């Protein structure tokens, strides 16, 4: 699959790391703002398949359920890593 420059930038975004840090530290307001930013950017670049995961993270943040938020974030990070690996493989061909 060919990714646009904007999609690659989204996948490389430091917001994923910031979200994990905010959740780990129990900084719920920061986590909420970060997931909102990630969700908006995903929609903007046409990566709707993250939407369900982001909704789950947002709901977990609203309940201040760090364990659930971390579990869903792990799924998102795995999906993101797979895509970045595919992009890297395509680039190195």
Predicted regions and their residues:
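Alpha-helical segments in soluble extracytoplasmic regions
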Residues: 24-28
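Amphipathic, coiled-coil-like alpha-helical segments
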Residues: 1-21, 41-93
């Amino acid at each position: 699959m060919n990714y646009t420059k904007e999609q690659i930038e989204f996948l490389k975004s430091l917001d994923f790391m910031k979200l994990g840090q905010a959740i780990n530290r129990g900084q719920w307001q920061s986590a909420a703002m970060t997931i909102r930013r990630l969700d908006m950017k995903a929609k903007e670049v046409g990566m709707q398949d993250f939407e369900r995961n982001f909704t789950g993270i947002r709901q977990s943040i609203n309940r201040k359920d760090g364990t659930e938020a971390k579990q869903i974030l792990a799924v998102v990070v795995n999906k993101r890593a797979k895509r970045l690996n595919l992009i890297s493989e395509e680039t190195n061909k």
